[in-house]
Amino acid sequence: MTVLSRACSRCIAQAATSSSARLGTTSRALSSSSTRLSSPPADPKAIAEAFLSKFSKGQTFVRRQLLDANQIRLFSLTLNRAHLWPTSSVSSTKTLEEAEPVQGTPIPPAYHLCYFTPAQLPGILGLDGTDASFNPDAPFTRRMWAGGSCHWPGADPNAVHQALLVVGDTVTEVTRVLSCEPKVIGKTGESMLVVGVEKEFRNGKDELCVLDRRNWVFRVALDPSKPAPLVPKPKELSQAELDKSVEGKLWREYSRDEATLFRFSGLTFNAHRIHYDKPWATEVEGHRNVVVHGPMNLIAMLDLWRDEASVFRGVGEGSMQDDEAVYYPQMIEYRATSPVYGREPYRVMMNKEAVDKKEAETRVVSNDGTVCMKGTVTDWSLSK
């Protein structure tokens, strides 16, 4: 086992090259990028094999961190949630604007993403601001968070003891590389590499609380000196079409502004410029505006599910916090399929009957009808 000290972190970064994205965007966002590549064609298979050879001994990289109350407080407020957990009596509980969560408060599903953020000196970051941890060699340095899964093995509501990440605990993150596979984007014929990474999060008692598997897509780097064609904005659905699209569904609508994206970037220490630098996002990477973080959409799907599932099950009485509904899924599998853009409304939705099912299909759908993220939330004990 390797402890990820400052020196070790630097070695990993220098063994890789700069990346260009840390969220789930898709091939359609830069479908014409093949004319703007910064490097000549390379052998994806050879680069994948060279990347895996760096981790062929199965080494792990370990970090430890205190889950402090202020970080999770600011993170929840940035997501416009005044409480970490849905409450049955808001009047009896102070909001996060008024007070930090007390020690021992469980961290909601996927909110662990505000901890264990990238830790690199500025000179090691890519030109686009992204960190270079666990990257393949050039030219495959443009990273996108394409999907993955999160499991909460210690959150079984029927267990005598639950192993959860909680505020005030010192937690250990264990990271390992699982895979690196060459792929081809069907629409463009462009080569890419798909890297699988696994992160374990263990509490102070060394109990596994979260198993977080992430799939990163690495595409060929773009040449910033060559202008990018913008992604056209599709026509939004009419109000009648929007109303019809949510019939029989539980849903919420969002339109993320630049301030929200900037705060989310700061709290996750994500310096990728597509989230806050509009000229970079539009002129270099070809987006039509700044891009909403993929993890923000993942959390939105989980927030919708846990709020509705908690109400349906009557969770709250006798839970760890007065009047708070503490309820976790068993797991979620998710995949980003298209970017979500700042100041463009979109909806997170799932079928109403899904709260009474073992598996709940969740979707992030732009108001022009584009499906931007898909997820399947698995409950603990309900029948299919």
Question: Where do the PLM segments sit?
Answer:
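A broad, structural surface signal
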Residues: S18, S32, R73, L77, ...
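N-terminal mitochondrial targeting presequence
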Residues: M1-A46
